[in-house]
């Protein structure tokens, strides 16, 4: 396939244009009066959302050169979502503004390397000021406020998330799932979460969110590494005959075994996900046993004379109502009352409490307390309902955003919302030292760019951007901001309009990182459009292979 190369000014122009296309689509969702975006799905009704990263990821531009720019800003939205869980729209708006302003400086003939140095100094100073003015989350009401703002002003969502955190603790496990009715409910169920995710991204069942979700799976617990597939064949065939999915938790899975599991998963012969066991050494064995008790299964270990190749039915496998696996975490959920499991869990908790009393190591005590909390506290499930499937999915997106924002707030605290935290933090730049005039240009660019979130929120509310920015510029109160819901100037903290510090910080860092890369780019290589058209007319890959799922491949 031949390539086309675009250089210098034309390259930058195309990239900036592509960034602007995505930023315009994402930016309209910002703030309480931001608009929803309808995203066409490959099947079923369109997805209606205000989630910035969902909007960004749905964009694929026909013009290859423009699409390179689009991918830049999609990457900033994705990175912000991965780190902070929220703030993707703010990051996109800032990145768009920063790229345009930095490009103006280069076009004007200013030394762009010095401009970038000045801008980098400015970003560091602003982030330090934001952190300095951050306040810790003190109570349930502040948690509800963060969740309410992040969910587009939905107070019910804020209160439900605060209630869930109250029941399982601020560091407890909270999941989101569809309700089977119209209601929005909080339910605390048996379950646990540990810090290990899938071994390969090819196990993800939801490619948009990159997670694996299984209903009523079997759980195979192995105290060993698996490299060859043959020992797994009997148990895989037994599970495949039931039609249920399988969660494999082992020391490690690699080589031929991993390849075979991925192949059969993609083929549809068996739904499976492989996860590394949590912990290390003896602690790993204890945690596997914790999971076994919770799921009513057994740990397959040769130390007890149980060989993997001899497991040819599901009797030694655990079960769960639901398992959710991300690249970093695995959550096991039960919502069925089982008195036998309850007794075993209580007995296990008592054993751990005794071990806590006996140990003299602070580190060991901390790890035992973590295990106890995982077994005892359970999992809070936010069950989201809606009158229609479209309404339910839209609300579920907002609940997930709000939950991420709340976690970020618990982690690093909160600052005044509505874009004013960055707006007022930019004042530290007035006294920031610089080495030359070109660096001063970079500092001033960041100062201007930090108005972008406030301007976008006001614009989406139908207000006058310049009037609001001018009014806030006169204020000596760093909590004073513009409430886009009421179109009034208020004390943002007292009004409950707050943002997680981590979200604000991450949005600025990621936006500037991408803007710097764009300005450093002077050429791009893309496929020729004619080649793409030729390929599309040439038929499908593989020339017409047909057939059913068949058996498993080993």
Curated annotation (Swiss-Prot):
Forms a cylinder of 14 subunits composed of two heptameric rings stacked back-to-back. Interacts with the co-chaperonin GroES. It comes from the Bacteria. It comes from Orientia tsutsugamushi (strain Boryong). PROSITE patterns: CHAPERONINS_CPN60. This is Chaperonin GroEL. It catalyses: ATP + H2O + a folded polypeptide = ADP + phosphate + an unfolded polypeptide. Signal peptide: none annotated. It is found in: Cytoplasm. Residues 537-554 have a biased composition (Gly residues).
């Amino acid at each position: 396939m031949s390539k086309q190369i675009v250089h210098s000014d034309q390259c930058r122009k195309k990239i900036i244009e592509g960034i602007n296309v995505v930023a315009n689509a994402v930016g309209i969702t910002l703030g309480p009066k931001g608009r929803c975006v309808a995203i066409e799905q490959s099947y079923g009704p369109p997805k209606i959302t205000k989630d910035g990263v969902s909007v960004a990821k749905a964009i694929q531009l026909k013009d290859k050169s423009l699409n390179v720019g689009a991918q830049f800003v999609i990457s900033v939205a994705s990175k912000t979502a991965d780190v902070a869980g929220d703030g993707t729209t703010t990051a996109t708006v800032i990145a768009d503004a920063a790229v345009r302003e930095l490009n103006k400086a280069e076009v004007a003939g200013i030394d762009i390397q010095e401009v970038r140095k000045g801008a980098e100094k400015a970003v560091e100073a602003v982030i330090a000021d934001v952190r300095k003015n951050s306040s810790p989350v003190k109570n349930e009401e502040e948690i509800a406020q963060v969740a309410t703002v992040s969910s587009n002003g939905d107070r019910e969502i804020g209160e439900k998330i605060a209630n869930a955190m109250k029941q399982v603790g601020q560091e407890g496990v909270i999941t989101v799932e569809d309700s089977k009715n119209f209601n929005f409910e909080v339910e605390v169920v048996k379950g646990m979460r540990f810090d290990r995710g899938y071994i390969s991204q090819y196990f993800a069942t939801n490619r948009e969110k990159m997670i694996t979700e299984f209903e009523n799976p079997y759980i195979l617990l192995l105290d060993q590494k698996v490299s060859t597939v043959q020992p797994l064949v009997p148990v895989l065939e037994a599970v495949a005959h039931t039609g249920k999915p399988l969660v494999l938790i082992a020391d490690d899975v690699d080589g031929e075994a991993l390849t075979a599991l991925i192949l059969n998963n993609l083929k549809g012969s068996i739904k499976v996900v492989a996860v590394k066991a949590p912990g290390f050494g003896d602690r790993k064995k204890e945690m596997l046993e914790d999971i076994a008790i919770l799921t009513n299964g057994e740990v397959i270990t040769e130390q007890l004379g149980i060989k993997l190749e001899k497991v040819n039915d599901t009797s030694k496998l655990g079960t769960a109502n639901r398992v959710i696996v991300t690249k970093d975490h695995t959550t096991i959920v039960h919502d069925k009352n089982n008195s036998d499991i309850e007794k075993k869990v209580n007995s296990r908790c008592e054993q751990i409490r005794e071990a806590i009393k006996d140990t003299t190591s602070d580190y060991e005590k901390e790890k035992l307390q973590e295990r106890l909390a995982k077994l005892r506290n359970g999992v809070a499930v936010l069950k989201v309902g809606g009158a229609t499937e479209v309404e339910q999915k839209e609300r579920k997106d907002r609940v997930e955003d709000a939950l991420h924002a709340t976690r970020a707030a618990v982690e690093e605290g909160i600052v005044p919302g509505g874009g004013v935290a960055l707006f007022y933090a930019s004042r530290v730049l007035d006294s920031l030292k610089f080495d030359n005039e070109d660096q001063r240009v970079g500092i001033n660019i960041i100062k201007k760019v930090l108005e972008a979130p406030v301007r976008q929120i006001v614009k989406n509310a139908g207000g006058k951007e310049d009037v609001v920015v001018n009014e806030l510029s006169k204020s000596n109160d760093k909590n004073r901001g513009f409430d886009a819901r009421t179109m009034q100037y208020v004390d943002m903290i007292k009004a409950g309009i707050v943002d997680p510090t981590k979200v604000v910080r991450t949005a600025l860092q990621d936006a500037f990182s991408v803007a710097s890369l764009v300005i450093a780019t002077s050429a791009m290589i893309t496929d020729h459009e004619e080649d793409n058209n030729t390929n599309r007319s040439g038929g499908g890959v593989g020339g017409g292979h047909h057939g059913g799922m068949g058996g498993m491949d080993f």
